[in-house]
Amino acid sequence: MYQVLAITGYKPHEIGIFNEQHDQLPFLKKALSKKITQLKEEFDIKWIITSGQPGVELWAAEAAIELKSSYPDLKVATLAPFHNQDERFQEAVKTLYEFVWDHSDYRDYITKRPYDNPAQLRSKNEFIVEKSDASLVLYDSETEGTPKFFLNYALKKQHQKTYPIFYLTPDDLEEMIRDQLDDETWN
């Protein structure tokens, strides 16, 4: 049983998503919801933690918030790396961030000040790994991107003690999209 699951992955531009109307975004959100559900049921996850970073983290937090109606014991925590993280976000992303922040069961800032140096982002990854029992990462080893910084800490923790890292890969996403399209074709 893992009480606390950290979720991270790519920022939108790293996977070619440049707005909330992207045609594959609903599939990605559904895949995140499906994977969170699977891990919740298999390991009795109680908390989902993200930093509220645009992309996979916000979409996963949104999915977890929606899943709370089916799983009332599921809680969501948003641990932003610094104050005013959202001030440079595009309006649609800022709206989603505010929704996630407002609907999180716990929210706080890891560093208690506005952004002033990259060390705040490193400490975010380290802090979230330390506060979690397992992680879910949307990641492709051939397209490193920002998840690699989180994975550095997660792999380090995994070598020291039991710390499962669950992956959601582009191949997994493609398979889920094909399955969903097949289901829609037959229904």
Residue ranges of model-derived segments:
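Acidic/glycine-enriched connector segments
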Residues: 1-186
